[in-house]
From Swiss-Prot:
Tissue: Lens.
Nucleotide-binding as UniProt keyword: no
Ion transport found in the keyword field: no
Function: Omega-crystallins are structural components of squids and octopi eye lens. Contains relatively little if any DHAL activity.
GO molecular function, one term: oxidoreductase activity, acting on the aldehyde or oxo group of donors, NAD or NADP as acceptor
Assigned keywords, A-Z: Eye lens protein
Name used for this protein in its record: Omega-crystallin
Family designation: Belongs to the aldehyde dehydrogenase family.
Amino acid sequence: MAGLPPPNKTPEIKFTKIFINNQFVDSVNGKAYSVINPCTTKKICDVQEGSKADIDKAVQACKLAFKRGTPWRRMDASRRGHLLYRLADLFERDIAYLSSLETLNTGKPYKSAYQDIVHCIQVLRYYAGWADKNMGQNIPVDGDFFSFTKHEPVGICGLIIPWNYPMLMMTWKMAPALSCGNCIVVKPAEQTPLTALYCASLMEEAGFPPGVVNVVPGYGTICGQSISSHLDINKVSFTGSTEVGKLVMQAAGSSNLKRCSLELSGKCPVVVFPDTDLDFAVQQAHEAAFQNMGQCRWSGSRAYVHESIYEEFVKRSVEQATRRKIGDPYELDTEHGPQIDEEQYTKVLDYIKSAQEQGAKLKYGGNKHGDKGGYYIEPTVFSEVSDNMKIAKEEIFGPVQLLMKFRDLDDVIDRCNNSDYGMAAAIFTNDINRIMTFTNAVNTGTIWVNTFHHWFPQAPFGGFKTSGISREMGKYALREYTEVKSVIYRIPQKDS
């Protein structure tokens, strides 16, 4: 990759404590837990383990920062934008370190981690620009009255971050939240807290006042639950599984009816018609299934291929999988790293076993890769998969591509929609009528046409059905972090 700075294979671990009120502090109970390198299964470091008491401290810091008359509340909206621009500049300055640290903690290839940070910078700058433009309206009403709306921050937002894209998902949530003037409590995934803690130090350097940003590492069952049920948190944003998302929503509703944004599980279809460039479609379907080792909510694991090109597509897909470079994520030609931890590693292998037991044909992979440790699984390709198999219905979250035949457009639309999930879908064809029918009929939050895995700060992202509620990115995300206040007052005389 041209212009890619060299990675640091042994990045210094600079911050391992909880960040509250612009200070790094020990946990209230003094506990710590080990962070593991998925490439080696060895410990990277110990990080302070947050608890309910630490979440309470972070929320209290937010409450003080959000009081009327504080520097944060009195700050001009344009100044909030300047802080986000400054944060983006600091990300850019430290991009090699952030990418190296993300690679160490997640095992994802360095070049992928680098692209994640590039996207983070773009998102920060996009929402920096929105800070003084998220305005209300003047509304014509009957009689001698004047009406207008104000967009105000929700208040204290709890942001629960997943382990598959730690920096990316943190930025997707915190950038619009801060642009709108909220205070935040960030709970990174217990597996991947290191870049979030370093990011906290950059927030202070950028000039965010104390208490505006707080980062509390810890386990979801403790810290995540505490955020979801906290009576002083006004909004929770969660990315993770549908199963846990339901628990978050229940806790949010049964506590103080806090606002809830959920980006949840997916089982995304990729549809290939014979009029497309076959080599390009094979390559795109390959990346759709195997990007980030399949650890994506938008992973295109279900590939529906027209029956007239199916056998050739299977052949070329296997050839593509054999060429995928697995190994040291710091090597710039590495495309494939480990799964995040032992639990996920075991879960994926169990899914592969169940597919074979149910009659799917294993064409490539299906095993642990290498004998030097690490949670590596080979890129795995199955053919002759039926829609009623467990592996075709449930989210795998691993490097498994399922290749299935279809007859015609109506057939494949019905099969795409025959899922509890609705995160994303893709179609490869040159027929505009087919494209329009597909995009209108398929029930997903995003549809890619002749591409996959492209998103932009300006465009919203989120799921239908049990893939979630609300949207991240774009103008739509600002709605998730604002309250709309309607003001109506009598005037002596209205003139048009």
